[in-house]
Amino acid sequence: MKEQLIATCIVFLLTLGFAGRGTCQEIPSTDYDAVKETIEQSIGWAIEKDFDAMFRLWDENMFHFWLFSDSLVVGLDSFKVYAEQWKDPDFHGTRFEFKDLRIVFSSSGDVAWYSCFLDDCGSYKGREYCLENVFQTGVLEKKNGRWIHVLMHGSYPVDKIPENYVRRFYSNLFEKKEQL
């Protein structure tokens, strides 16, 4: 009986060892800090308005979809056109914060994906505004020794859409129901 128990334990431990191979790495890799910095600079670039530095953070075949339907951008060339709006001298990034940032690496170690809640603040014509608690996700790939974004998505959970957006984009829906 003792031999069977030992054999069962050995088989179980070997099974765990093989089952763990090829899975994702939730333990920080040696690239964790580089990935985190790339994620942070994808928003933080706006404080210095360094467009060249920002564009280096993105892959040629990148995909970007932010809060509004007109923010769907595919490809770096299209992203450069989309970014023209941020060249307005009255626009400035002021501060940002990533909360609950979670980064996971692929088993090969050359792909990372993340999620967080983002506060992204800027000013326009001297008036500050903030996007708070945006649920942000993204995928980065390591190419030629550098981590770059291939996908970024930002949204609000449907139960946490800020009231000013509900009023701005959905007020007609509520007015129609009230008239019925």
Task: Tell me the role of every PLM-derived stretch.
Residues M1-E26:
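Bacterial Sec-dependent N-terminal signal peptides
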Residues F63-D77, K87-H92:
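A short gly/proline-enriched turn/hairpin at secondary-structure junctions
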Residues W58, F68, S107, C116-D120, ...:
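A mature extracytoplasmic/lumenal domain signature
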Residues K80-E128, L180:
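Surface-exposed, charged secondary-structure patches
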Residues A19-L57, R168-L180:
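Short, low-complexity N-terminal intrinsically disordered segments enriched in polar/charged residues
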Residues K142-N144, V150-L180:
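Low-complexity, intrinsically disordered terminal/linker segments enriched in charged
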Residues S42, M54-F55, M62, G75, ...:
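Hydrophobic pocket/interface hotspot
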